[in-house]
Amino acid sequence: MKQPYLLLTPGPLSTTASVKDAMQIDYCTWDSDYRHVTETIRQQILAMAQANPENYTTVLLQGSGSFGVEATIGTAVPRTDATLMIAINGAYGHRISQIAEYYDIPHIDVVFNEDEAVDPVRIEATLADHPEITHFATVHSETTTGILNPIEALMPIMHEHGIVTIIDAMSSLGGVPISIDELDCDYLISSANKCVQGVPGFAFIIAKQATLAHTADNARSLCLDLYDQWQAMTKQPGKWRFTSPTHVVHAFAQALIELQAEGGVTPRYQRYRASQQLLSDGLQALGFELVIDPAIQGPIITSFKYPNVDFDFADFYQFIKQRGFVIYPGKVSNIPSFRIGTIGDVDTTDIQRLLTIIGDYQQLHR
């Protein structure tokens, strides 16, 4: 079946034909070959994230990226004598807060405007005001707008206060250079269908073993017990506790091969960045304003304001879709906007074609 359009979205995204082909065979979860693939993936993820395997482990978890976030929050934070600080500047930070609410976890939300990055100075001031804080969570690439938050500046602050750190790197790991060894974070979460360019079906959590080892019995959920999942994968390498998405795992294994063939994370970041820059410059030339300052813009997805009050996004969307691309509606709460992603099997040639299509639309609606 021919793919009718490219996804210019933050994931699920457009994948290569070879990633799709990897899902054409059925696999047995107990088979040694399959378990070898799973175990290899776990080690490759550590290498991709520059995480020392003597200190860190990768835990794979069935479900979407949010399953991974919920499992981490629900396992990392003890049932008593713990308070979670959440730095929020978009919908995915608010989702962490929702998880804390569901689990009755005491939490302090430090909320920023959606068009501003998390400010380390304000975070440090909050820590000074709240000595009860034991854990910290934030989103690296907040795809509500496309902001890339300054995790490199935040982690040293947390270390000074002995805070356990949780980074939602759903839309950055694999597409933005990250060194977990340098960050020295406790948990970093991502998903198969983001910058590694696999398909949806599982999340993965890179966890500091010394921290995770103290989380037994913390989990509020059987299926989302990160500690128990880790123990199962450690005692029986390649084994998941419950039925794993076998086809998705093989697609991800192929996607990792292709990431290496591209040269690794840095060349992929450069491709994403080139596409984002072309998109940003091109749409501004066509009359669309950016939602956020380019200084805090990441390469994953870009938000644009509606050009005027009469702009019909539904009509705009269909015009573009009929010509081979799918984009995203806006998620900023108080600014009418739309979003366009620049990750996946997409390059500047595709972005230039999109700009031509949008230029044609603008000509028709002058």
Swiss-Prot record:
InterPro entries: Aminotrans_V_dom, NH2EtPonate_pyrv_transaminase, PyrdxlP-dep_Trfase, PyrdxlP-dep_Trfase_major, PyrdxlP-dep_Trfase_small, SP_NH2Trfase/AEP_transaminase. It comes from Lactiplantibacillus plantarum (strain ATCC BAA-793 / NCIMB 8826 / WCFS1) (Lactobacillus plantarum). Gene3D superfamilies: Aspartate Aminotransferase, domain 1 (3.90.1150.10), Type I PLP-dependent aspartate aminotransferase-like (Major domain) (3.40.640.10). It is an enzyme of class 2 (transferase). Involved in phosphonate degradation. The keyword Metal-binding does not apply. One of its GO terms (molecular function) is 2-aminoethylphosphonate-pyruvate transaminase activity. Belongs to the class-V pyridoxal-phosphate-dependent aminotransferase family. PhnW subfamily. GO terms for biological process: organic phosphonate catabolic process. This is 2-aminoethylphosphonate--pyruvate transaminase. The modification N6-(pyridoxal phosphate)lysine is found at residue 194. Its EC number is 2.6.1.37. Keywords: Aminotransferase, Pyridoxal phosphate, Pyruvate, Transferase. Homodimer. Its cofactor is pyridoxal 5'-phosphate. Pfam families: Aminotran_5. It catalyses: (2-aminoethyl)phosphonate + pyruvate = phosphonoacetaldehyde + L-alanine.
